[in-house]
Amino acid sequence: MSSTGCRVLPRAVILMAVIGGASMPLAPCFGQEAAPRPEVFNQCAVCHSTDGSNGTGPTLKGLFGRPAGTVLGFRYSRAMRGAGIVWDAKALDDYLRSPQDFIPGNVMPFSGVADSAERAGLIAYLRSLK
């Protein structure tokens, strides 16, 4: 190979890497990739957003680590405001299994997710919504 070929080949490899990398999504590089959205979330999406805006229900964006009943601009039930819990995997699992049993008097019109695998997938998705 000629000396010109030796200089061009590394440049071509770098160029291909740059072009190929430019077509890749940037979210994983910044830790923003959401977990796969489970089908059971379709029930949640009727009332809840994942983009930071409130609907019939409060946004679920940033749910993990947030005290229950504290999203600005959303009017919570007295039960939810006074629940005294911080949303983590255990609290969400208990709540999603049976919302009324976990926080009696909350007004979310949802009976729960009985299947533990569906709850686990839903919780993983909710955890990824930062």
Explain the meaning of each model-derived region.
Residues 57-58, 62-78, 97:
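Solvent-exposed helix-loop boundary motif
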Residues 43, 47-50, 63-66, 83, ...:
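Structured segments of extracytoplasmic/periplasmic soluble domains
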Residues 32-55, 60:
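Sequence/structural segment immediately N-terminal to covalent heme-attachment motifs in c-type
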Residues 19-29:
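C-terminal segment of classical bacterial N-terminal signal peptides
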Residues 9-17:
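Sec-dependent signal peptide hydrophobic core
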Residues 72-93:
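Short Fe-S-cluster ligation motifs
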Residues 88-130:
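C-terminal capping alpha-helices of c-type cytochrome domains
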Residues 1-9:
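N-terminal secretory signal peptides that target proteins for export/translocation
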